[in-house]
């Protein structure tokens, strides 16, 4: 999964939920043998980082992040572990950053860390 994300090449049918404006702004459409695929524009890709981390340990990150995807992971942790993981993620995100989670995940007990902005989207406070 991380290797696919790092390459920045995705099947075009995987763009559900992206507006036409965002598709045009952030992606290039494949042509010829690459038809049916899209690639993240190089000027955006150079600002992207993908890292495997152990969420139950302190995160080995020096920079802060604008966006974190942590989808369908937290459901496997008990409530105290979820809270500890959210605190770790909170520390490595910039204020106003966006956290994407899975549909089954809800962090209503972490209102002092994140505010719900959509069904699966939280904003870091």
Q: What are the language-model segments listed below?
A:
Residues 10-11, 85-87, 117-118:
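Glycine-rich, phosphate-binding/catalytic loops in enzymes
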Residues 83-95:
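A short glycine-rich, Lys/Arg-flanked "PGG" loop and its adjoining helix->strand segment in the class I
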């Amino acid at each position: 999964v991380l290797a696919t994300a790092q390459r920045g090449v995705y099947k075009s049918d995987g763009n559900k939920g992206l507006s036409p404006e965002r598709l045009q702004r952030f992606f290039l459409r494949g042509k010829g043998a690459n038809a049916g695929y899209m690639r993240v524009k190089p000027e955006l890709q150079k600002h992207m980082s993908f890292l495997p981390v152990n969420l139950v340990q302190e995160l080995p990150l020096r920079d802060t992040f604008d966006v974190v995807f942590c989808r369908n992971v937290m459901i496997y942790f008990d409530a105290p572990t979820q809270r500890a993981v959210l605190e770790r993620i909170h520390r490595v995100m910039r204020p106003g950053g966006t956290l994407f989670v899975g549909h089954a995940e809800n962090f209503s007990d972490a209102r002092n860390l994140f505010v719900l902005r959509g069904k699966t989207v939280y904003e870091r406070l």
